[in-house]
Structures are given as C-alpha cells and as structure tokens.
A protein has these predicted regions:
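An N-terminally biased module of ancient metal coordination in phosphate/nucleic-acid-related enzymes
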Residues: 1-44
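Short acidic, glycine/proline-enriched helix-loop-strand junctions
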Residues: 23-32, 41-46, 173-199
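Short acidic/histidine-rich active-site segments
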Residues: 158-176
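Mid-to-C-terminal alpha-helical segments outside catalytic/metal-binding sites
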Residues: 183-232
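Non-catalytic positions within long, well-ordered alpha-helices that form the structural scaffold/packing
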Residues: 6, 99, 156-157
Length: 232
C-alpha cells in the first residue's frame, strides 16, 4: 500500500484502523507498526496514526481518558464513523461534548451512509455546529456507485466537505490512490477547491492546525449539468 501511495504522488498517510466493539484499537501496537513502516519507506512518505472511531459508550469513555491516542497524528482531529442501522438524536449532544474537550470531529464517508444520504440535513447541522466532513476518493471516482458519487459532488458544491481521503483497505480493490478523484474535483470545481480538499486542509489536520479552507454551508444547489459528470 505504501508503494501505491508513492506511485500516486501521495506524501502523507494516516493509518486509521477501526476502533469499535469488533476491532480493538491497540494504540501501542499501531504505533510500533507505524514506526517499522516509516523506517522501511524512509523519507518517501510521512506516516502518522489515527483511527476510524465509532461513537459507542466504551469508546467514548476511552476518549475522555486520552483522546490523543485516537486522533490524527495524536493532535486534535478525530475521524468519526457512524453505523448504518441507527444514528440516535442524542448524537448532536455527543458530538458537542466531544468538541468541548478540544477534539474536532471529522465525519467520514457520509456519502456511503444510507441514513445520512436520506437525511443530509443532519450532516448540515453538524457542520454548522463545527464538525468537519471527509468523503472518499473512490466515491468521487464512481467506485461506490452513482448515488455516492452524486451526493459527494453535490455536498462539495454546498460547502459541506473539507477533506477527501482514500479510505484504502488493500492493494487490489481499495487502494491508496487519489489521482482520479482529484481530477474529478478539479474538473467540476477548479484547482483551488481540489488543492483545499486534497492538500491544504489534510496537511493542516495532520499538523493539528486550523483548517485554511472552511466554506460557508450553502442551501441545496441544483444538480450539475449532466455533461459535467463525464470527465473520465
């Protein structure tokens, strides 16, 4: 996967294993593996750790004790993943409580979550509350179907999206590759937006800085003209 990233021109990678009831997040072991890989790749990649954090009670208790273990590069941005069975109304308060600790939630791949696709007003509320949103590069490239692609592009246009990430899982079907997604965003929104989502905001989160690009959330925009989708 590291070789895939280097070939794609990627310079910074955050390894984000799941942290939930099924997958135990062992911070010490994750850091050991990160250090081993960093030594192997040298200065070709800058590697950090984080996790895809599920908001279950046990996880939240651990977060209160030491949030840095779970955050990107042990700074203050946290990747948050929702399940597709239910997102309780209390989630508004849960996200707010996380923010009060100084942690900045980044909601991951909402364009692939059926609940949030059906109720994008919830996503908009959280963004207006100060949360951030990350969509998957594969969604923008059409790899997760036309609905995920459509919603991801529309939400970028509405100012809901702050990051694009690979969400890579392997070297075959979900690889560390972002060039097709970058081309898609640049074709529809221009180079400035592409740089913000793929380079400038991600680097700021990596370093624990304020995001340089936080667009104002717009009301729902009309769908783009059909011809704009055919850029492959």
């Amino acid at each position: 996967m590291a070789q895939c990233a280097i070939a794609d021109g990627i310079t910074h990678v955050v390894a984000t294993p799941h942290s939930n009831s099924r997958f135990h997040f062992d911070f010490v072991r994750v850091r050991e593996l990160r250090d081993e890989l960093q030594a192997a790749v040298g200065d070709k990649l800058n590697l950090a750790t984080g996790c895809d954090f599920h908001l279950d009670p046990e996880n939240l208790d651990s977060l209160r004790k030491d949030a840095s273990h779970y955050c990107i590069n042990q700074r203050n941005y946290l990747l948050v993943e929702f399940n597709e069975i239910s997102i309780p109304p209390s989630m508004d308060q849960t996200l707010h409580e996380i923010q009060l600790t100084g942690v900045r939630p980044i909601i991951t791949h909402p364009e692939r979550n059926g609940i949030l696709r059906a109720h994008p007003e919830r996503l908009k509320k959280w963004v207006r509350q100060g949360c951030f949103v990350q969509v998957t590069g594969g969604s923008l490239a059409g790899n997760f179907g036309p609905r995920a692609q459509k919603d991801a592009l529309q939400w970028i246009g509405e100012g809901l999206v702050h990051f694009v990430a690979s969400d890579a899982h392997n070297t075959r079907t979900r690889t560390l590759q972002l060039q097709p997604a970058y081309a898609a965003v640049m074709a529809q929104f221009g180079v400035e937006k592409a740089q913000a989502l793929f380079l400038e905001n991600p680097l700021a989160a990596f370093e624990g800085r304020e995001l340089p690009h936080v667009p104002e959330v717009e009301d729902e925009l009309p769908p783009p003209r059909r011809k704009r989708f055919f850029f492959f």
